[in-house]
Amino acid sequence: MGFTKQYKIDFDIIDNQIVLSNNYFQKHKGSFRKITGTRFGKVIGISEYETSLKTWANMVKIYEDEFDETLSRAGQVIEPKIRDYVIAKTGFNFHSYDPKEVKWDLFPENPVFGGIPDGEPVDVYGKLAYDTNAPMLEIKTTSCDSLVYKKINGNLKIVFDENGMPIVKKINGKKDSWFDSNGKIVISPAYYCQIGLYLYLRNITKGMFAIAFLEPQDYVHPEWFEAKQRDIRLVPVQIDRKAFEVLTNKAQLWYNSFIRTGKSPQLTSQDWEWLRENGIA
């Protein structure tokens, strides 16, 4: 979708910041979005791919992300199958939430942080079972191969060949990037912070990643996906709450400085390029 509000009317660029108009800010500030697990790493500046500006623009609702339809559909269809696989593999009963039913937020009492984990352990009565030492679940689907992408309006989308299959740039290229020289999976700081935020909000410390490596055909026919026929790694993680609080404090400061004021972070050269790609500036 890109920018959904009007440049020079709803927002402007002043002193190297995007500044919301007073009319827009006063009218919409009560509905600005919160910092979720997905946004957390971008907000505190550890994202490999983008600065916090795009996240800011999305949170103040002047910009809406354009998702790759292929990736979105694959995730929606395949993730429940992975969750079932993890339940069978671990014996933990992980519950997933309907975003609409919980209004996209399991932490409505928190004014700054929110979101929905991929799975939470529950007992036979449907009550949270963290007291049994069960972990929180975070699911990641990633391609085995490095695929070819094309940038459209600042967003990357998969490129397909004449047979409707994703074009492979390097076999196992993406999968290899998940492992260190000793063959151990390395969780990126952004992903660690994603589950870390939800662990922190639940006042627990243990989580688990389920990382599924997909083949090209899984993106074309996700309904045919069979978890037992794919490489799925279960990786336990743990946070130190006191250490993690340093990060939540940093994110809280960012929120107070930029969301509550209606003024963005200072624009970087990367931000200016993104704005130009979207017809701004």
Swiss-Prot record:
SUPFAM superfamilies: Restriction endonuclease-like (SSF52980)
Pfam families reported in the protein's UniProt record: YqaJ
Top-level lineage group: Bacteria
Alphabetical list of InterPro entries matching this protein: PDDEXK-like_dom_sf, Restrct_endonuc-II-like, YqaJ_viral_recombinase
NCBIfam families reported in the protein's UniProt record: MPN551_DNA_bnd
Protein name per Swiss-Prot or TrEMBL: Uncharacterized protein MG373 homolog
Originating organism: Mycoplasma pneumoniae (strain ATCC 29342 / M129 / Subtype 1) (Mycoplasmoides pneumoniae)
Taxonomic lineage of the native organism: Bacteria, Bacillati, Mycoplasmatota, Mycoplasmoidales, Mycoplasmoidaceae
